[in-house]
Amino acid sequence: MGKEYDRITDKHADFIIRQQLFFVATATADSRINVSPKGLDSLRIIDPNRVIWLNLTGSGNETASHLLKDGRMTLMFCAFEGEPKVLRLYGHASSHQQDSEEWEAHIGRFPRMPGARQVIVMQVEQVASSCGFGVPLFDYVGQRDMLTDWAEKKGGKGIEEYWRTRNSRSIDGEPTDFG
């Protein structure tokens, strides 16, 4: 059933780019575990052991806080249509804000998205596939545009203020890369 790999194969990459949704999990030794759903056109495979994703403004910034302290990250992709499969990428990651060298190196890989907050760069150390037999089937309808519409209405200064007031501390009180 399950198999482990030391890199993202071409077959894995094909599966990943067809998914409309993925999940990001992070934690530190003494924090709550955070799992966040991600969508939109926000993930890129750079090479067999490196992926990046564009982190948009959200109600919290747990991922950035956890990465500052620990760096461990898991990404999970599930097949909600077609053949069942679950694919996990395990590794370490770092968060990079606007105007950083990593941001500048990667932001051009994504379409313009209002509220773009960080580029997350993940070094993939292990890939694991499992059967996905228990994952339900869903019909994909489309991406929601509420987040990008909200960010567009807030404008650049409004988003920056939101980052300072709402995204500078984790739910555990730890600083983020905006703190």
Model-predicted regions and their roles:
Residues 1-179:
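Binding-site signature for planar aromatic cofactors or substrates
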